[in-house]
Structures are given as C-alpha cells and as structure tokens.
Amino acid sequence: MFLVLNDRFHLAGEWVVGGFEAKGLAYFFVLMALGSLVQKQLKWVWPYLGFACAFHVLVGGWATIALLLALMGQAVFRSSDANEQREQVSLGTVLKQHAGFVLAGLLLAAVGALPPLLADIAANPATKLMASQIYVQARISHHLVFSAFSASRVAGFVVLLMIFGMVGSRLKRLDKSRQTDWRLLIAFAIGSLCISFCGLMLSGVSEQASVLADHSVGLLRFYWFRMADFAVPCAASLGLVAIMQLLWRRGMLGRAASTFSAVAIALAMAWIGIDRHSDPRPRADQAVLPSYEDNQERTAGTYRNWLRVCDWIKNNTPTDAKFITPDQQQTFKWYAHRSEVVNWKDVPQDAQAMVDWSQRVGWLIQPQRRAELGLMTYPDWRLRELAVTYGATHLLVPQRQVDLITDACDFKQVYPVDPATKATYVVFEFPVADVE
C-alpha cells in the first residue's frame, strides 16, 4: 500500500523502490529508524539515521531533521493527560540518555556529508551560482521547484494529504498504549511537510527579482519536497492498516468495513499492477525511447532494435570507445557497456563538471530537440570538430534522420554493415586520426 501511494500520489517524483541507487539503501535505514522509534528503542534510531546519511546524505539528513521537528513538536504541544505525558518522548532526554548512540550516528553521517561538502571547495562563486541555476532551473526543476510541478501531481498529493488527515484523526481511537507510537510517526510526517513548506517559500522567492533569488536557487538544490513524498505515504499506509485492525475488533459491522477496505485496496493495487505491466519495456525505456500510442508494434520494434544496436556495439567496438548518442534514450551505457559524451539523465554533482555538462547539452542534445534532423543538421566538418573536442569515436543516430539528409554523410557506416539495410539506428565511425 505504501509503494502504491508513493508511486501514484507523490508530489516531486520521489521514489523509494524502483532502481538500485544509494538512496534506496538510505530509505531502508530510515525505515529501520522509524521502526525503532515506534517500538521505543530510541537509542538505535540515531545509528540507523547515520547509516542513511552515509549512503545518501539528503535522504538521511532530511529524515533526521523531520524526526527532530517531530520531537520538538511533542515538547511544544504536550498532552494534558498525565499518562500520555509519561509516554511522550523528550528530545533533551533522548540526547542525554543516548549520547553515545547519537555520536555514532553523527560519525556515520559524516561519511556521506563530507564528500559533497568538499567537492566544490575549489570552485569560484560564479561557477557555483551557474551550476545551481543549471541544476535547479534547467535540469531538475520538476523535482525541486513547486511551480514546475504538474497540476495532476499537486492534485494527487492533495488527495494523499486528505487521506493522511483522515488517518490521523481516526488513530485517536486507538488504545492509549499505542497512541503515542502512532503520534510520533504522524509527527514525523508532519515534520516532513514543514520541510516541504520551506521549499514552497524558497520556490516563490527564487522566482522574484530580488537579491535573495540567487540564494534561494542555491538552497533549492537540496530537494526540500523529497521527504514528504516518502513520509506521508508511509504514515498514511501504516495508519490505514492500524485502522482496519481497529475496525476488525469491533464486531460484525466493523469486520465487514475492514474486509471491504482490504478488498478495495487489493483491487486498486491489482489495477495499478496491470496498468504498469501493460507495456513490457523497462520503465527507464518507457520514459524516453520513442513510443507510438496508435502503433504498439512499432513501439515494440523500436525497443527491440535499440537492444540490437546496443548489443552490436558491446560486441563489435573497443571497450574504450566513446559515443555521441540520441537524446531519446537513457539506457545506452546499461546495454552497450560503452561511454557516451553526454546524456540528459547523467548529471554530475560538482559545480565545474555541471557547467561543462551544460555546454555539452547545448551542442549535442538541444539540436536534437530543436530540429527534425537532429545532429545531422550539422555539416560533417562540425561533427568532426565535436568528436575531437569531446573524444568521441562513434556517432549513433536514428535511421530516419539519416534518411532525411540530402547529402550523404562522409563518415564510415559500421552498423548496419550494409548501408542499403534499414534499421532503426545507425552507427558511424569517426576517422581515428581526427579523434586522436
């Protein structure tokens, strides 16, 4: 249920399960920390969060901040009930009683925090600002800037917030011995929403003509909406399960309501599963490879031919070959096991490398988006210059662009071997002397 809510009702595109990345491991440790939190094994919360920071400093860092906000919120909004006051967790008490575990968490967190802090230490302020603008406003705005979020994503997240609010109010009916546990989890989600609210404010400031705009852009790099995409579905889904358990204990009517809810959730999950598997291509290829809604066979054929050309490249080119590749793909390195000059999906993190990446995008990706001929709009001498500049040995382009050019390309076509054979993709080899 959590994965469905995260996949369908996220605001900023944050996923928890969907690929093998450092943040997936970080979320595992965040979940372990939350498990320790609700089981009142507070000493283990901090090492788990430290491990999360070590794998992904933003995931672990925002989770830590959300938890600290939750604990501080408990101190501010203390219950008037004496029994509940004894159950509530004091931040000061936690830090005093578990100082060693907190220190261990900080040391682990430093493993993930120091590398990004040191990466840009030599970059000048102008380069850092330019890199922030590229990252926030040009490349990742759909994850970082509220105004770039689609209306459907905002509407979906509002629905999720309504579910979350309903769950929070219903959980008050749980017995007192467990209410504090759920209150901490709900408070953690609210803490993540407070972080997102700060991101909303920064998004607004970044779009104003003021001296604070540049500073806001720099701060928006840190994914202020990320943790809410995780924490709110997590709290809502676990709360829904708790509510169904509560209903089950309330006689026949409650059991009927609980059963109906479980069946409805199962049917929704089944429908989503069927919808996701209606296209057999991996999601990375679904997202970028050419698709034709009115011609599924052409879509499947394009995917098969993409696999074929990548397999040919893997088996027939030197391991140190470097390719200029099509914009409409993000899996070349995965299938072909070769490097490429630039890819829209592969964004470096240090400031100078990001500026260099943006220049490559300008020369090699933007032309593919502006013109039907893509890179074939360049004359051969210009393609040769770009190959020399970036050390490219091969050019991979769609067949349709080759078919549209009026003057034959002077570069040697190596795939398909017979130029008369038509394939979805064509590989040209740059002259060795030019590249060297």
Give, region by region, the residue ranges found by the protein language model.
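Membrane-interface micro-motifs in multi-pass membrane enzymes
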Residues: 1-32, 37, 223-234
